[in-house]
Amino acid sequence: MQGETMSKTYHFIGIKGSGMSALALMLHQMGHKVQGSDVEKYYFTQRGLEQAGIPILPFDEKNITEDVELIAGNAFREDNNVEIAYAIKNGYKFKRYHEFLGHFMNQFTSFGVAGAHGKTSTTGLLSHSMKNITDTSYLIGDGTGRGSANAQYFVFEADEYERHFMPYHPAYSIITNIDFDHPDYFTSIDDVFSAFDDYAKQVQKGLFVYGEDSNLRKITSNAPIYYYGFEENDDFMATDIIRTTTGSNFKVKHDGQIIGEFHVPAYGRHNILNATAVIANLYVAGFDMALVAEHLKTFSGVKRRFTEKIISDTVIIDDFAHHPTEIIATLDAARQKYPSKEIVAIFQPHTFTRTIALLDDFAEALNEADAVYLAQIYGSAREVDHGDVKVEDLAAKINKPAKVVTVENVSPLLDHDNAIYVFMGAGDIQLYERSFEELLASLQTHM
């Protein structure tokens, strides 16, 4: 594949999408010619593309020519995108992101990471460890991609939405958990399970699943299945756990033997599990545990997952959490790192369908914070607001006063001393965060 496609230009329709931008960066670094098109609006992935010198064009049918290979983002269709419409009308073939990836990964020993939650952090941890030990290409769902022309290994994130992971047949895969999400597509937890079960059957050499997840205990695969977790009946067990304000220390036991002592500079119980999954996979794949331990220590995290900054002596955390399970994990991490601080959560629900389906669970998760503020629901491009749910409905279910804030007025957040602020959501919650940062900075200048 290397030789036959080097002369082609890959054109990405919707290049700012997190998976798409990561793939574009990876192909660029492998020596391929890459360009893409998208909307004008700023998205956090575009900085990496711009730094790499990858052209980002407006959507235009002129971009579709004989000499480009087309890769199309999943959200773009004939009825909402001029380039797709032009390609279909004129007989130009294109592959969806996941179709292209399924074909592309066959030239490597591939490591997949699937699961309802924790995919991106775990993919980041796995690729960080591997790239420091050997030549590895990878794609992370935070928009980060790295390509190496000599890589024999490929690490990627596998997304269950609309069963997008079905073209993938990895050598190894981790599945972090199974949970009901994407209610606009999946009808029930059983429907979600069947998708993961189908994916598991395509894994070839080893499947690593969280042992305390009752659904994952029912998963079947043609490859050997290894369970990881905190219990004695797991094949790889995290033990002797010490959680501190600088991260988490633990040992991993396999077949009654300690295979290594590890430290991750990450917070929350979920990150110990993510690291244990990575350790289990690399142990079975024959990697040196001393090297794995060495590189886990230097993992700096992935974009929009517990990303911290300090503005005017105030700690602000940005996180992609948009499901109750993720909110609980993020707040747990915040408490570990800042045990003496008030935890203020600012949450923006993402999609009306998810908010309706999980309203009570969201309220319960947000109860873990000391104070709660809510932003207006961020609707997806795939849905229409029928007025069936409002953010005030969520506020009413939270067992402490939950105020609704706007981008224009985030001043109620100033009512807290000795607090850290955790902004969570998958929509445009970063606009609220930026507004709060500007407010803090302006107060500083007037002091």
Swiss-Prot record:
It catalyses: UDP-N-acetyl-alpha-D-muramate + L-alanine + ATP = UDP-N-acetyl-alpha-D-muramoyl-L-alanine + ADP + phosphate + H(+). Its main location: cytoplasm. Keywords: ATP-binding, Cell cycle, Cell division, Cell shape, Cell wall biogenesis/degradation, Cytoplasm, Ligase, Nucleotide-binding, Peptidoglycan synthesis. PANTHER family: UDP-N-ACETYLMURAMATE--L-ALANINE LIGASE, UDP-N-ACETYLMURAMATE--L-ALANINE LIGASE-RELATED. InterPro entries: Mur-like_cat_sf, Mur_ligase_C, Mur_ligase_C_dom_sf, Mur_ligase_cen, Mur_ligase_N, MurCDEF_pg_biosynth, UDP-N-AcMur_Ala_ligase_MurC. Pfam families: Mur_ligase (PF01225), Mur_ligase_C (PF02875), Mur_ligase_M (PF08245). GO terms for biological process: cell division; cell wall organization; peptidoglycan biosynthetic process; regulation of cell shape. Cell wall formation. It comes from the Bacteria. It is found in: Cytoplasm. Its EC number is 6.3.2.8. The gene is murC. Pathway: Cell wall biogenesis; peptidoglycan biosynthesis. GO terms for molecular function: ATP binding; UDP-N-acetylmuramate-L-alanine ligase activity. GO terms for cellular component: cytoplasm. Belongs to the MurCDEF family. ATP binds at residues 115-121. It comes from Streptococcus thermophilus (strain ATCC BAA-250 / LMG 18311). Coiled coil: none annotated. This is UDP-N-acetylmuramate--L-alanine ligase.
